[in-house]
């Protein structure tokens, strides 16, 4: 363990997907964690709050004594067994608390008493977090090329095919539109930023990187927003625009939002509950933009959606969804994106069908 306890290269730890046994309270972990970290707290939220109050009123020694009283006996043993099991599963892992202080040192000492020598992250999560922020800022200074195009143009697929492509929507677990949620909940803002930083570091380490290829995104992807340093660079970046036939875009959207999402919901929850969740997902997507559609148009499209769902449930056909998807694209999504693109017209360096854009990227 001695070599692992020397001055730590935080970037190397992140690049290596180093397992982290994060002993912070669940609320701290939920607010922000590193990719692949597992949360096995020394103290739960109420215990941590009690110790914090004691620290403010009576000082460090009293708080430490209270912590040991709260985490003792069977509770201590149960948590110790969980840490031991985690270390046996991840023998190259590290302990991590907020700043590399009391909590990780206490767990390290308790493990050592059982014969396990587990290193800890010096500086804790805060040090790793700062490394992630600095890495994103530094790597965002490299040239960026954006892939643009209306909804259903296959932009995400194109980005994923590039060795220097960064799938921002995949990292955010959201596809950007009001229908963009997936079955996986979005990460907290800090966790999303940490995951993005690690992805940038990994791609940069794999190759001599001339530039990043990213999808042309707004400030936010669902509940997550892009780091300002990256957003500022994207605002100035050149754009290659995918211009595919409307019918081809419809087929991509049919596959993504009706066929695949129905499959994913029923696979996760079973036929009946999955159908209910799928139906609610589509209704929620439409409801989210009701004010922009106008309440009368929203009501009309909702009725059409209900009929399409009834048809899909009875026959399996998704054709009925085109009756509300087509006007939604024509009246809302396409005009909105084209308006946004017009403001960046000077940045457009290439236009063409999906395959032409793919070939152009390959030639760069």
Swiss-Prot record:
EC primary class: transferase
Residue ranges occupied by any Rhodanese domain in the UniProt entry: 14-137
GO biological process, one term: tRNA wobble uridine modification
Catalysed reaction equations from the record: 5-methylaminomethyl-2-thiouridine(34) in tRNA + selenophosphate + (2E)-geranyl diphosphate + H2O + H(+) = 5-methylaminomethyl-2-selenouridine(34) in tRNA + (2E)-thiogeraniol + phosphate + diphosphate; 5-methylaminomethyl-2-thiouridine(34) in tRNA + (2E)-geranyl diphosphate = 5-methylaminomethyl-S-(2E)-geranyl-thiouridine(34) in tRNA + diphosphate; 5-methylaminomethyl-S-(2E)-geranyl-thiouridine(34) in tRNA + selenophosphate + H(+) = 5-methylaminomethyl-2-(Se-phospho)selenouridine(34) in tRNA + (2E)-thiogeraniol; 5-methylaminomethyl-2-(Se-phospho)selenouridine(34) in tRNA + H2O = 5-methylaminomethyl-2-selenouridine(34) in tRNA + phosphate
Protein keywords: Selenium, Transferase
Active site per database record: 97 (s-selanylcysteine intermediate)
CDD domains given in the database record: RHOD_YbbB (cd01520)
GO MF term set: transferase activity, transferring alkyl or aryl (other than methyl) groups; tRNA 2-selenouridine synthase activity
EC annotation from Swiss-Prot or TrEMBL: 2.9.1.3
Pfam families reported in the protein's UniProt record: Rhodanese
Annotated HAMAP family: tRNA_sel_U_synth (MF_01622)
Family note: Belongs to the SelU family.
Assembly and binders: Monomer.
Job of this protein: Involved in the post-transcriptional modification of the uridine at the wobble position (U34) of tRNA(Lys), tRNA(Glu) and tRNA(Gln). Catalyzes the conversion of 2-thiouridine (S2U-RNA) to 2-selenouridine (Se2U-RNA). Acts in a two-step process involving geranylation of 2-thiouridine (S2U) to S-geranyl-2-thiouridine (geS2U) and subsequent selenation of the latter derivative to 2-selenouridine (Se2U) in the tRNA chain.
Protein name from the UniProt record: tRNA 2-selenouridine synthase
């Amino acid at each position: 363990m001695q070599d692992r306890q020397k001055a730590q290269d935080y970037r190397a730890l992140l690049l290596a997907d180093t397992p982290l046994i994060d002993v912070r309270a669940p609320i701290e972990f939920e607010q922000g964690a590193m990719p692949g970290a597992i949360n096995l707290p020394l103290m739960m939220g109420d215990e941590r709050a009690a110790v914090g109050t004691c620290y403010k009123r009576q000082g460090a020694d009293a708080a430490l004594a209270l912590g040991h009283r709260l985490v003792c006996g069977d509770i201590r043993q149960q948590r110790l067994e969980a840490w031991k099991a985690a270390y046996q599963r991840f023998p190259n892992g590290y302990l991590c608390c907020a700043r590399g202080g009391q909590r990780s040192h206490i767990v390290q000492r308790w493990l050592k008493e059982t014969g396990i020598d587990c290193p800890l992250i010096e500086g804790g999560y805060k040090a790793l977090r700062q490394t992630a922020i600095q890495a994103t800022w530094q790597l965002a200074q490299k040239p960026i090329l954006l892939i643009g195009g209306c909804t259903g143009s296959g932009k995400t697929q194109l980005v994923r095919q590039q060795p220097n492509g960064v799938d921002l929507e995949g990292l955010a677990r959201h596809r950007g539109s009001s229908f963009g949620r997936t079955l996986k909940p979005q990460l907290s803002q800090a966790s999303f930023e940490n995951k993005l930083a690690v992805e940038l570091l990994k791609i940069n380490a794999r190759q001599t990187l001339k530039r990043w290829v990213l999808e042309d995104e707004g400030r936010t992807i669902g509940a997550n927003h892009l780091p300002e340093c990256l957003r500022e660079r994207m605002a100035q970046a050149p754009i290659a625009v995918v211009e595919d036939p409307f019918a081809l875009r419809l087929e991509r959207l049919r596959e993504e939002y009706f066929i695949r999402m129905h499959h994913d919901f029923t696979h996760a929850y079973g036929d009946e509950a999955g159908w209910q969740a799928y139906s609610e997902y589509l209704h929620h997507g439409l409801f989210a933009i009701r004010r922009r559609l106008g309440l009368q148009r929203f009501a009309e499209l909702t009725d059409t959606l209900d009929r399409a769902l009834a048809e899909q449930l009875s026959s399996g056909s998704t054709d009925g969804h085109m009756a509300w998807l087509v006007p939604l694209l024509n009246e809302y999504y396409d005009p909105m994106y084209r308006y946004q693109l017009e403001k960046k017209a000077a940045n457009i360096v290439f236009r063409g069908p999906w395959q032409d854009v793919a070939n152009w990227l390959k030639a760069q």
